[in-house]
Amino acid sequence: MTSVVVVGTQWGDEGKGKITDFLSADAEVIARYQGGDNAGHTIVIDGKKFKLHLIPSGIFFPQKISVIGNGVVVNPKSLVKELAYLHDEGVTTDNLRISDRAHVILPYHIQLDQLQEDAKGDNKIGTTIKGIGPAYMDKAARVGIRIADLLDKDIFAERLRINLAEKNRLFEKMYDSTPLDFDAIFEEYYAYGQEIKQYVTDTSVILNDALDAGKRVLFEGAQGVMLDIDQGTYPFVTSSNPVAGGVTIGSGVGPSKINKVVGVCKAYTSRVGDGPFPTELFDEVGERIREVGHEYGTTTGRPRRVGWFDSVVMRHSRRVSGITNLSLNSIDVLSGLDTVKICVAYDLDRKRIDYYPASLEQLKRCKPIYEELPGWQEDITGVRSLDELPENARNYVRRVGELVGVRISTFSVGPGREQTNILESVWASI
């Protein structure tokens, strides 16, 4: 029984897809356990970029099983589009499995997402308008439609009719918006269900059988710990649990079967959307990091907010997600800076704190306390070991590990597979 969970430790976009792809080489099953197509991950294979939003990164290994777990909310339209994209690129999807217990995103979820966000005005959350939140709302309210329901024509029609009638009343009475047509949605989405039914199964059985047989299973999280609905910067969060604990709920695998948790972070910090960001940069250094790091959302295309590495955030993520190993990405983006900074604590009302406050009002008053380190000018994109890094870059990597309190297993100096350097094999240490 061998399993590893990959989680983002910041606000998403840390390079989880790249690390999952890297670790997938030694895994036999790769599974997603939460989120939806609001998450974007980019994988570079032989210099070619592949952008996925829903299907696990392991799909590029045809001999390995890729699982969309029950904790994922699935937009069938997006899924069918993504499958077609992969087929056009010559990628087989015969190894994909989708949980029959996963909930379905339908057009009324997306419309409600947009209307709710518009109604918030200046207090908007910064949602991707993918219908994720409303789909999880229906799940919690016990009125959601699952993949198993989507495949049953009569059940789907019955539940869609009830849900749509309720949502249309909401659209018309509360938001003065146009109602949606039952027949159009039913025909389109039932057809999508028929297109994906070959992949649908009880994925909890597949995952547990694999673990019981001694196979290596890799669990892939979406977003990041700081977007977790319980542990993140609420309410500027996603609607699910990206923390490692979300694996057990979102995959149907018990906590006793989780061995390692790899936290993925960048050598700096980025964030899409609104919400607290203590180390955010508004100067030319921030703009340089954004441009060099290509910090634009995979899903939205929006410019990401960027800032210095925040070890307070990272220690919070380590604690609430039980991180055992760290993967440090995008060190190369900091090349060329005379000085690099790491936030080691916050100043809250002239008192030094090293925890991440739950209160948004307190966070607004938090000022980062920085430790400055000398930068490096060298191009490090061709580095293939820690010893090859310039001394200042090497010291930066070591200091990050010390401040977070977790050993660094891999570090990356670019987006390619070959630019990921191993310091310690996660699989071998289990």
UniProtKB/Swiss-Prot annotation:
The active site is at 13 (proton acceptor), 41 (proton donor). Plays an important role in the de novo pathway of purine nucleotide biosynthesis. Catalyzes the first committed step in the biosynthesis of AMP from IMP. Its cofactor is Mg(2+). Keywords: Cytoplasm, GTP-binding, Ligase, Magnesium, Metal-binding, Nucleotide-binding, Purine biosynthesis. Mg(2+) binds at residues 13, 40. Its EC number is 6.3.4.4. This is Adenylosuccinate synthetase. SUPFAM superfamilies: P-loop containing nucleoside triphosphate hydrolases (SSF52540). IMP binds at residues 13-16, 38-41, 128, 142, 223, 238, 302. One of its GO terms (biological process) is 'de novo' AMP biosynthetic process. It comes from Streptococcus pyogenes serotype M5 (strain Manfredo). InterPro entries: Adenylosuccin_syn_GTP-bd, Adenylosuccin_syn_Lys_AS, Adenylosuccinate_synth_dom1, Adenylosuccinate_synth_dom2, Adenylosuccinate_synth_dom3, Adenylosuccinate_synthetase, P-loop_NTPase. Signal peptide: none annotated. Gene3D superfamilies: Adenylosuccinate Synthetase, subunit A, domain 1, Adenylosuccinate Synthetase, subunit A, domain 2, Adenylosuccinate Synthetase, subunit A, domain 3.
